[in-house]
Amino acid sequence: MVTEKNMKLLSPVKYEYGNLKIGGGGFVTGITFHPTDSKTLYIRTDIGGVYRYDFDKQTWTYLADKVTADDPAQTYPLAIALDEKDPNKLFFTCGDKRSNYICISDDKGENIIQKTLPCSVHGNEVGRATGDRLIYKNGRLYFGSQTAGIIYSEDMGESWQSIDLFGEKNISLIWTDSEGKLFIAGCSGEANSPDGVTRGHTLYCSTDGLKSFVPLTAPDPVKYENSSYYGFVPQRITSDSRYIYITFASSGEVFYGGMGAYACDTGSLSGGKVYRYRIENGVTVFDKDITPDDHIPCGYSGICSNGKMLLLSTVCRKNGGDMIYTSTDSGESWKIIMNGLEYSRFDWNIPYMKPRYNGGGNCVHWISDIKLSPFDSDTALFNTGTGLFMITGLASGDVLVKPFCEGIEETVHLNVYTTPHGRNRIIDIIGDLGGFAFKDYDSECENSFANENGDRYITCLNADLTLSDPEYIVATPRGNWTGKTKGGLILSKDCGSTWERLPMPRGLSEFIDQKLDNIEKPNVDSGWTAISADGKRIMWAVAGGRGFSNKAVCYTDDEGKTWQKSIFTDSSGNSADEHNVKIFSDYYNSELFFAIAERENLGLYISRDKGATFREVSIK
């Protein structure tokens, strides 16, 4: 018996913390060079905060280290602005809808002051890919918000005033000329929709300091097949000494966000345009449609000009991945410099991005921003849904594309497992990328959660292993976006190095079969799994979407060759009502499994027959 007298006080253990290096992994939503200071460069990410590049150490520095779980708003930046005259100043807007801020720094983000915004903001909502939407000019801050239209502050964010844009609340971009007299604003067109499915006008111009706006020529709506909403929304804007250029995109199959969803972050765009404008007598006028190809099913988004060269990207191109174009005649003609794996050389310096792990293709997608360096016309940066990339060789034509992610870690870690022994030390399951099995703590993982062809599974919700044989692991991934892997239950016998997909438990019930049909579609949750302590029984709460129903829990003793359905009863032995559960095994007793009932009054089920039946127990 342990008492105070015989207790032994152990010496404190000193822990050292670091991160397992993955590299990139998430959506970089915008790139911001300072126009005159060659050592000031920022990016924003959808869920990973703002980063500043350290040119001396050649790595990205994370600026949200002080963020807490109680107030995570800075991890969701929506827009960045800089002071053209003072490279030390940094402004960015951020929010999680509950807390919404304009953040101001006088030392490049080392110290940040938050001031509350009068509108809802979220850096991981639809529209995050467009911009820019924050401007600092002549002591004023201008913000094109997602929910309150255009607002501005003359006292560094202490107070804000609204500017009416024909009732439009969802702004996609704002831009002003060097003198701050000419303004252009893009919007979703929702407020002026004639019928609820066709956007109203989406592009406006002001020449009187934002006192009034007039419509600026924009593409007419096109009723694309399979499109949910019709009409083109401005995505990005750039200018040079001769022209202003604006990219547009038209929604595809929008599954969320309604007409407020207008950018690549809905995952589908039906069409795109690139328009060129000129300034006549202080007024912006339409000059020419310079769209490279009207017949490609995609949008156009990233665009940048330095006066000599114009760069442009497609976004959400359905077949072959996004393309990058260059023009040296203001868009009169275009040259492709990247199309899938063609036209450019690639240096895949991050292992999981290699084509052989991505169906033999290019992992680049969601190019919504591209920026030429103001200080090196041979170099440009572009964003993707899996990190930041650099282009070099633009002047010579020997174009090299490579990830530029050193220091950027923007992955969603859904669970992590340590192995007591085995060839790998850490099993890390991740949103979007699936998972990695790390042999050691100091090097990147080559590739892990993939099928026999190297095609990656994505977004595992959980995994399980036994203490007796940690080489034997089960996991529940989604099938990837290309359809080259299908979701379900996967099994590894070599500690996560290789995987096989187990047969589906079809025929147990129509309810389960419907869920299995859904799981075979791209990017659908497959469920929750657990394995008995002796490694001989695998449990699976089948999902096929959100939640893990207790009516869809099954088990196998022969790695999926045959399946049986688990039975759930309440504390009286009657059939339990349907609700979601998560299954867990006892790590020592092979007969014991537990199920946590995810409902308003949380419940606990226990199985003493290896998961065949679960009975609810009373808990206090």
PLM features: residue spans?
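Extracellular glycan-interacting surfaces
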Residues: 1-620
